[in-house]
């Protein structure tokens, strides 16, 4: 058995009163002769850990020791030594790891951001192998439905994909998450992970065209979403020439600029384009001039300087950055 942490406090029998523990002498915690600020542990916690130290130092690989680790984890799920000893017990006793996985899921229900739990679950999944894939993906999906930015869940999910498989439906899953919340930067990050790492999609170059179309549509719907703009830029990683020459990127910027609202990232993207060999055409110049007149800033013959000046006004949080960008322009030097 994997042990049960779901014991009602009123029903718990102290270890010292349990017949099966009568032969064990608990080992108290040694804080030294004169502890300055000793921790005021509860009586239950102190007793469980005293007995745990006894079986741990005795290297007792027994069923009762396994049950004791469950109690200790129920009191402190972050104790690395307890989890480590539990793994030794599981292997020695040849415990059914499907049962252990259920135990971990119960513990995680109230401690989902505890690193030790995820480390242990990964160990269990690794032991079970590919058969654990679906349950692990479903487990992370359950966690992410409550907390879409849960770091440990995303990290575990990526580990499962890379080690146990399951790539086939992952891009669709990312699309589902983005359909629910287009601002979910974790879903954008996972989408990029999938198109660049999946062995079934062909890599970034093979996916670029369709992903650009997907991202352009997302940006048009919510141009104020920084995540989608960053994703678009990431689709041209190490391909800056392709990026600045892609007609879809420039036409997207122009379309957003003409709306005169939520154009911050379109404008910063245009600055990146204009800083390259590409010079904005008349349509872009007209759109920038309209924005300049809208916010009443000084006219400049160089469009890149004008863009920086506009960004200084519409993006005050990063005003120092835009001032620096302007100072780096050849025309401002």
From Swiss-Prot:
EC number: 2.5.1.58, 2.5.1.59
Species in which this protein is naturally found: Pisum sativum (Garden pea)
Protein name as catalogued: Protein farnesyltransferase/geranylgeranyltransferase type-1 subunit alpha
One GO cellular component term: protein farnesyltransferase complex
Function of the protein: Essential subunit of both the farnesyltransferase and the geranylgeranyltransferase complex. Contributes to the transfer of a farnesyl or geranylgeranyl moiety from farnesyl or geranylgeranyl diphosphate to a cysteine at the fourth position from the C-terminus of several proteins having the C-terminal sequence Cys-aliphatic-aliphatic-X.
Subunit structure and binding partners: Heterodimer of FTA and FTB (farnesyltransferase). Heterodimer of an alpha and a beta subunit.
GO-annotated molecular function: CAAX-protein geranylgeranyltransferase activity; protein farnesyltransferase activity; protein geranylgeranyltransferase activity
SUPFAM superfamilies: Protein prenylyltransferase (SSF48439)
BP GO terms, sorted: protein farnesylation; protein geranylgeranylation
């Amino acid at each position: 058995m994997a042990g049960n942490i779901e014991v009602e406090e009123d029903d718990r029998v102290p270890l010292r009163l349990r017949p099966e523990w009568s032969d064990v002498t608990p080992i108290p915690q040694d804080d030294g002769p004169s502890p300055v600020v000793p921790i005021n542990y509860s009586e239950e916690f102190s007793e469980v850990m005293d007995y745990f130290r006894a079986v741990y130092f005795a290297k007792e690989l027994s069923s009762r020791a396994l049950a004791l680790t469950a109690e200790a984890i129920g009191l402190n799920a972050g104790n690395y030594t307890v989890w480590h000893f539990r793994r030794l017990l599981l292997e020695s006793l040849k415990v059914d790891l499907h049962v252990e996985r259920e135990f971990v899921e119960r513990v995680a229900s109230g401690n989902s951001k505890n690193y030790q739990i995820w480390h242990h679950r990964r160990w269990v999944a690794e032991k079970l192998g590919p058969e654990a894939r679906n349950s692990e993906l479903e487990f992370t999906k359950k966690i992410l439905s409550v907390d879409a930015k849960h770091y440990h869940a995303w990290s575990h999910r990526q580990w499962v994909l890379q080690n146990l498989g399951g790539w086939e439906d992952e891009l669709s899953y990312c699309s589902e998450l983005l359909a629910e919340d287009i601002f979910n930067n974790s879903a954008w990050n996972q989408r990029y992970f999938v198109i660049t790492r999946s062995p079934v999609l062909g890599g970034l170059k093979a996916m670029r065209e369709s992903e650009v179309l997907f991202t352009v549509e997302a940006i048009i719907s919510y141009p104020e979403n920084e995540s989608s703009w960053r994703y678009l830029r990431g689709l041209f990683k190490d391909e800056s020439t392709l990026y600045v020459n892609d007609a879809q990127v420039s036409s997207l910027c122009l379309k957003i600029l003409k709306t005169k609202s939520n154009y911050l990232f379109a404008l910063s993207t245009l600055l990146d384009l204009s800083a390259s060999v590409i010079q904005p055409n008349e349509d872009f110049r007209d759109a920038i001039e309209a924005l300049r007149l809208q916010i009443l800033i000084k006219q400049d013959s160089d469009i890149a300087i004008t863009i920086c000046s506009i960004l200084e006004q519409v993006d005050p949080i990063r005003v120092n950055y835009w001032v620096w960008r302007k100072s780096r322009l050849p025309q401002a030097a």
